[in-house]
Amino acid sequence: MSLHEFDALIDRMKLAYEYAENLGQYVEAAKVLYQINDQLPDDLQLILEDLENPESAKSFLLKYNNELKSAIVNYRQRLMNF
C-alpha cells in the first residue's frame, strides 16, 4: 500500500468517526473501521468481532479507538520510511 492510498484510508476512518459522533451511525462506522483494520499488516491488526448491533458497534468504537489509531500511526511511519 502506498502512502497516498494509506492517507485515503485514514480519511475514511475520520469520516467513520464523524458519522458515529454526529449521526449515531455506529454500525456503519464500525464496519468501516473493521475494513480498515483488514488493510493493516498482520502484525498491526486488531482481533475484532463482527458488529451488527448498534450497542456493540458503539462499544467497539469506544474500546478500539486508541488502539486502531496507534496501529495506523505505526503503519504510516513504516510507509514513510520506505
Q: What is each of the regions a protein language model found here?
A:
Residues Y26-N65:
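Acidic, low-complexity, intrinsically disordered interaction modules
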Residues E67-L79:
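C-terminal amphipathic alpha-helix
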Residues E18, N22, K31-V32, S59, ...:
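Short stretches within intrinsically disordered, low-complexity N-terminal or propeptide regions
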Residues F6-A8, I36, Y64, Y75:
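Amphipathic alpha-helical coiled-coil/heptad-repeat segments
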Residues M1-V27:
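Short terminal alpha-helical segments
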Residues S2-H4, Q77-F82:
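Short acidic DE-rich linear segments
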